[in-house]
Amino acid sequence: MTFELAAEHEQFRRTVRDFAEKEVAPHAAQWDRDHYFPVEVVARMGELGLFGLTAPEEYGGAGLSGEDGGFTSLCLAIEELGRIDQSIGITLEAAVGLGINPILTFGTEEQKQQWLPDLVAGRTLAGFGLTEPGAGSDAGATKTRAELSNDEWVINGSKQFITNSGSSLTSVVAVTARTGAVTDSQGNERAEISALLVPAGTPGFTAEKAYDKLGWHASDTHPLSFEDVHVPAASLLG
C-alpha cells in the first residue's frame, strides 16, 4: 500500500495552491477585517471546476472516475484553500458536502436538473439547514415543523449557524423539519425528520444578519427563520 498521491493529484494540488496564493492570500486579511464574503472568488473557484469535482458530467461536473470519485481532489482543494484562508476552505467544503451532495445523492431527477448545474458551476451556492437554537445539530431534536396542506409544505421554525445560506449567490437551502411521526421496529413512535428544498427569496424565508463570529469572518453564516413558508410537495428531498 502506498500513501503517496498520484501524479495527477499532485498536479491538481499545485494548481489550487497557485490559485490560493495569488487570488486569496493578498486579500484574506482584509476580507476577514471587513466581514466580507468574496463572491468574486467563488466565481473563480467555479471556473476552476472546484465545485464539480464529485459531480457527474451530466450536471456539469468533472465526472472523475476511480475509487474515490473525485473526493481526493476535493480534499486537496479544501486543504490548499484552508491553508491560506479557512473561510474560503469551509465555503468549498460546505458548498459540496452540504449543498451539492445531498441533492446529488437523494434528489429526484427534476431536482437535480433544477439545482445542480448552477451549483456545480459555482454560479450559485446551497446551504443545509439542520442546526437549531436549543437543539444543536441533533437531527432527532429538530423543532422546525412542516405540514403538508393542499400539495404544499408549510414550514415554521428557525435554524442557526447555517453556512452559505444568505449571500447573493445562495439559491436554495435544504431544511430539516418534523413532518410527522413513524413507528420503529420496537413499536416506539418517534418524530419523522425530512429535508425540504426551500429556494432563496421564498416568502416567509429570511436569512437574518450574518453572525459576528470569533473567526472565519469571510464565510457566509446566518441564522434562518421560516414563517408560514410554502413550498411545493415536490420539494421533499429523498
Where are these regions (language model features)?
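Amphipathic, small/basic residue-rich leader segments at the start of a protein or domain
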Residues: 1-91, 113-114, 118-121
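Short Ser/Thr-interspersed hydrophobic loop/turn segments at strand-loop and sheet-helix junctions
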Residues: 49, 78-82, 177, 198-203, ...
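A glycine-rich, basic-preceded beta-loop-alpha segment at the flavin cofactor/substrate interface
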Residues: 68-71, 200-210, 220-238
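Glycine-rich phosphate/pyrophosphate-binding beta-alpha loops
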Residues: 83, 135-137, 160-167, 216
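N-terminal glycine-rich flavin-associated loop
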Residues: 89-110, 136-139
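A short, Trp-centered hydrophobic/proline-enriched beta-strand micro-motif
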Residues: 122-130
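A structural signal for short hydrophobic beta-strand segments in well-ordered beta-sheet cores
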Residues: 144-147
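A short core secondary-structure module
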Residues: 156-206
